[in-house]
C-alpha cells in the first residue's frame, strides 16, 4: 500500500545521507522528464501547451491569396487542422502509444517547401525593378514567410523537448559526474511523488548485494511472492492512478555487484515491457557508465 511505498522512499532518502540536502531542492530541467517517464497529467498538460501555442495562429495577415506563398499557407493550415484533430483524439492511458510521427513528417516537408519558396524570392526581387506595388507585395510575403519560419522552428524545438519516445518507452538512464546532484534529484522527485500520492519506489545501488535484483527488490518492500507478481501489482497501482508507477535506482555504479548490471539491466527492462504502467529511472556516474550500462541499451531496449 501507500504506506509501504512511503516508508521505502523515506528510508532510501535517509540512506542517501550527506548527498541529500532538501534545502537545495532541485528544480532542474531534468525533473520534467520524470513526468514524461510516468506519463502524468502534468506531462500531457505540457504536451498540449507546447503544441497548442503553435496551432493558435497569431497573425491575422495570413497571405492565402498570395501567388508566392498562398500554397504554403494552405499546407500550413491543413497540418494545423490535422494536429488539432490528433490532439483531441489523443489517448492518455498509460499503455497507449503517442504517435504524431506522420504529422511531424509533414512539418518537415513544410520546412523544405518553405526553403524552396525562400530561394525563389531572390530572383523575384531582382526582377521587380521599380514597381512599388509589386515590391510591397513581395515584402509582405517575405515578412510572413519569416514569421512562419520562426514559428515552425520554435515549435519543432518544443516538440523535441517533449521526448515522446521516452513517454512511449519509459526507461530513463541519468548519467552525470560525481556531485552533480543525481542522488538529490532522484530523492527529491521520489519524495514529491509520494507526497502527491503517486506510486514510487527508490532503491540505492548499494542495496543490491549478493542476491539477484528480483529478490532484493521484493524483500526490501516486504512483498511476499515472485518478482513477476510484484511487478503485476505495482503495474496495477499505476493503472489505477492513471499514470505510471516509478521504479528508481540511484547510483547503479555503487555496491558490490555494480558490474552485474551490465548483464542484468537489459533483462530488467525486457521484463518491464510486459507492464506498461511501470517506468524505470536509474542513475549512474559518467566515469562508470561503460562498465555498468549494457552496450546498445538505447537501441535494443529503447532506453533514453
Language model features with spans:
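Walker A/P-loop-proximal flanking segment of P-loop NTPase domains
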Residues: 2-171, 242
